[in-house]
Amino acid sequence: MSRPDLIIILTDEERAAPSYENHEIRAWRNEHLPARAWFADNGVSFERHYVASTACVPSRPSLLTGQYPEVHGVTQTDGLGKLHDDTRMRWLRPGEVPTIGNWFRAAGYDTHYDGKWHVSHADLMKNGKPVPTNSGDGHVFPEAVQAYLDADPLGEFGFSGWVGPEP
């Protein structure tokens, strides 16, 4: 028997559909989110789950390491009040706590990460600012994308293919 392919999808700011959800909203979701319906029909959904932290940044390393924020050390969220390089902001350090990327890679899986990371500061920097990979209006900067792929900033966390910068 061959081992299964796995796709893990993490999203921000969602909740389970409430029991009182009306028919119109359910119909809209089914019509406009067909890929989500496909994954729900063909995958595994966890109906009773809890986050390790109400803040998104500490929750991500908890999901990826299986450890509480007090163990992996990421307990705060960066933003306007605290930037990535603030001495009060602690990120997960490579090799400190293994992630599911490390475990799956060790088991022979090809591990890829796409989207918001917010587990460590992974942006490539130039002149003190993150290297942009697009102009914001849809124009992609291929050389910047390649720079992220070549740098492989999530490699030590067990993932490849990530292209920044963080939103």
Regions found by a protein language model. Give the residues of each.
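Formylglycine-dependent sulfatase
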Residues: 1-167
